[in-house]
Structures are given as structure tokens and as C-alpha cells.
Amino acid sequence: MRFSVIKITLSGLCLLIFVAFVSAQSRHSVKGTADADGTILTVTASRTDNKTEPIKSENLFLYENGIEQKIKNFSYDPSPARIVLLVDNSQTLPTDIEKLKQATMEFAYEIFDGDQLFVVAYDEKPEIIQEWTDDAKKMETSLATFRKKGNPYLFDALNSTVSEILLPLMPGTRKTAVVVIGDGLDRGSKTPFDKILNELQNQNVVVYSLQIPDRTGGAYRRNQPKAREVINQLTEGTGGKIFPLEEASTAAKFICDELRKNRYLLSYFPANTSSYDARRVFIVADEGINIRTKSAQPPNIK
């Protein structure tokens, strides 16, 4: 993932200043729209009681920092999903390349019409293996570049995934997910764990994982969670789920089905809380309804 450098002429500089001004005005307009809509959460909800009636806002109870919030709107999201498969390709990962390929390919067999996959492999640097596609044959060919090398810089890879792959799709695309295929170990990222978790939550990106056993055996990690806890916090913190790598086929079907059939958008105006503070989010539903969302709203501080 590279950043391009552009030489700017004097006339080009004037044009850039004009564009920046127009863009700033546009951002003010977008912000106004967002304020009018309130805060938006992506929510996963499904019935377990065999009832057929739709899930409504009256079935839900939302809290921020323990204070109940009034739900403005709750609606099913039928839009296609954009799923990034983030695959650990580091040297000491306790599995082989063929298993990583097989697990990745399972998603190509399960996505729905309109869904797209993006494959990134990482060691010290994230590497684009396959850009957005729904073509299983194209994806299978691209996976030949998987290898095992170096150390896992998971947090940096997540940061690049959000900033360079997912953010350019927003705000038009709300249904975004990352599937981490690895054990959660990070050895050397410059991006702090808390920072990337906050960014995932702030952008409503849901993290799932096909988890591989921790290669360190649960060893203490200075200034960051243990590998297993990294996976737990990424998934629970964003409203995702964990599956063992050995159940890749089941996991891919579950994740793709869930994103297409059970995703909702919930909007509300936060009351008695400050957007400049981190706010714990807690949502419960009537009996017979399973529901998940992210665990927190990060502070609104740039």
C-alpha cells in the first residue's frame, strides 16, 4: 500500500486551494446531515423464537454509560457487504499456507450477489493480494502469492485496511467488515491497539475472526493485550464473532448470511452524555431476539 507523490505547479496549486475550499463547504453540509440523522449504529439482530414479524425499535433498549437512549429509527439494511479478508502471513504462524488459502476461498463461495471481497496479507507490511472482486477464480489465482515470512504487524495492517481500503467507500457504504485470519499476535506495529480499536468502532466496521491457536501459548505482552485477548476485544468491541480456523466453511456461510440477512441501522440522539467522552454502548432486546453491536462510542476528538 503506497502513497503517491504529486508535483504541483503554481496553477495547480490555485486549483487545489479552490477545491479545498469547496470540499470544506461540502464537509460542513455532510456534517449537518449527520447531525440531523443523529448517531448511527450498525446492529446485528435475529429472531430465535420462530416468530415471523419484523424486529422493531419497540423491541429494543439502548443505553450509553448506563443511561437509556431514545431510539429514533431502526431499519433493515439490505445493501451489499464489503468484506476485507486480513490474513496473517508471518513466519511463525502455527498453520500452513494451504489451510490459509482454503479458509480464504470459503468466502468466495458464500457471498451474495453484490457483495465484494478484498484480500490483504500481512507480515511487517500489509500487501494487497486481491482488490475488490466477487470472482472466485480470480481470487484463487491471486492466493498463490501467500507465503510465510517475517513478524506479524497486525495493528498496522488493520490501520491501513481501514484508512486505505474501507474509508474511501464511506459514507455511501455502511456494511463493512474485516475478517482476521490469524492468532491476534502483533510484534512491532507502530499503531497502538487502543487506537485501531477506537477507529474500527468509530467507523462502524465489524470484525470477525477465524482464530488460530496463540503461537505464544498466552505469553504476557507488554503495552498490549495477549494475542487471544486481542481477537476477543476486536470482535466483541465491534459486534463481531470468533470461529476456529478449522470451521472456516461454517464461519464463511454464517458471516455472509448474517451480513445479508440480519444487519440493521439504528439511529438515536445521545442524551445526557458527551460526545467528547468515551461512551459504553449496551443494547438489549425482548426475549427471543439475539442482538449485537459495538461495545463503545469513542470520543469525538480529532
Please name every model-derived segment:
Residues 105, 113, 123-218, 222-223, ...:
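Exposed acidic/Ser/Thr-rich ligand/metal-binding surfaces
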Residues 9-20:
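Bacterial N-terminal signal peptides
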Residues 1-8:
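Positively charged n-region of N-terminal signal peptides that target proteins for export
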Residues 32-39, 223, 233, 245-302:
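C-terminal "exit" segments of structured domains
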Residues 25-29, 147, 157-159, 203, ...:
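Extended acidic, low-complexity intrinsically disordered regions
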